Amino acid sequence: MITGSLVAIVTPMHEDGSLDYPRLRSLIDFHVAEGTDGIVVVGTTGESPTVNVEEHCELIRTTVEHAAGRIPVIAGAGGNSTAEAIELASFAQEAGAVAQLSVVPYYNRPTQEGLYRHFRSIAEAVELPLILYNVPGRTVADLSNDTTLRLAEIPNIIGIKDATGSIDRACDLIERAPKDFALYTGDDMSAAAFILLGGHGTISVTANVAPRAMHEMCAAALAGEALRVREINGRLVGLHRDLFCEANPIPVKWAVARMGLIESGIRLPLTPLSSASQERVLLAMRRAGVNV
């Protein structure tokens, strides 16, 4: 099981929106050097809705190849079509990802039984370990804890990224889930509490900007060092908040560009960060000790 701080890595783009693979390779090196515990590529923060299938597959391939075993790579491979999700999962397995992150189908609003059958079908078709991704704020459909626990009985469904931010739901899963079922939060603001309560890690937006601090905070939380967690997280709270002052990944891509790690390219319908929001994010970065 991968524990700790897994970065939901941004997808570097040139100003014209074309993908910047050299910068992606540099970002991978940056995260290896900073102690990040894993990389999730082509997820929400990686702008998965606006990359085409060929680009999606190439981003997975490039990340796995350049990581070269130095850091685990989890491939974003979900979708609202079960058949297409299976195709992406199959490619991720062939490319050498250690697992796939599969989002709850969006827009078509399946029932709990539909969600169960969707994920079961992917797991039966592709052996690659599957991490469920529940983010009802984006998908509308909400994978219930009961359905999650049904899915946890399937051998290669190995965990969940719960981006609800609900500590009540997290505690219920921590209490009822199998001990080898990985529990990740997708909510940076509650990540410290989530891990201290028994979660295994976070799939983090903040880790794009403060990877060392997120790694250290998660390590302290996993060790039960609450005072150390409080100290580190106190510096990061502004980032947890202000990296969502506009729709993710608009603020975090601006922040990573401000650090000089990528260009500021982003694809429509997402637009560049407003001037007022830039001031907020820059202040949060400085308070977190980011060198900008």
UniProtKB/Swiss-Prot annotation:
NCBIfam families: dapA
Annotated protein name in UniProt: 4-hydroxy-tetrahydrodipicolinate synthase
Quaternary organization: Homotetramer; dimer of dimers.
Record pathway: Amino-acid biosynthesis; L-lysine biosynthesis via DAP pathway; (S)-tetrahydrodipicolinate from L-aspartate: step 3/4
Alphabetized HAMAP family for the sequence: DapA
Stored PANTHER family: 4-HYDROXY-2-OXOGLUTARATE ALDOLASE, MITOCHONDRIAL (PTHR12128:SF66), DIHYDRODIPICOLINATE SYNTHASE (PTHR12128)
Location, primary (coarse class): cytoplasm
Cellular localisation: Cytoplasm
Family assignment from sequence similarity: Belongs to the DapA family.
Encoding gene, per UniProt annotation: dapA
Recorded GO CC terms: cytosol
One GO biological process term: diaminopimelate biosynthetic process
Protein source organism: Aromatoleum aromaticum (strain DSM 19018 / LMG 30748 / EbN1) (Azoarcus sp. (strain EbN1))
Keywords for the protein's UniProt record, in alphabetical order: Amino-acid biosynthesis, Cytoplasm, Diaminopimelate biosynthesis, Lyase, Lysine biosynthesis, Schiff base
Keyword presence, Amino-acid biosynthesis: yes
Keyword Lyase (UniProt): yes
Residues annotated as site: Part of a proton relay during catalysis: 44, 107
Coiled-coil residues: none
Binding site for pyruvate: 45, 203
Species lineage: Bacteria, Pseudomonadati, Pseudomonadota, Betaproteobacteria, Rhodocyclales
Enzyme superclass (EC): lyase
Catalytic activity: L-aspartate 4-semialdehyde + pyruvate = (2S,4S)-4-hydroxy-2,3,4,5-tetrahydrodipicolinate + H2O + H(+)
GO molecular-function terms, A-Z: 4-hydroxy-tetrahydrodipicolinate synthase activity
Active site residues per record: 133 (proton donor/acceptor), 161 (schiff-base intermediate with substrate)
Stored Gene3D superfamilies: Aldolase class I
Enzyme Commission code(s) on record: 4.3.3.7
Function: Catalyzes the condensation of (S)-aspartate-beta-semialdehyde [(S)-ASA] and pyruvate to 4-hydroxy-tetrahydrodipicolinate (HTPA).
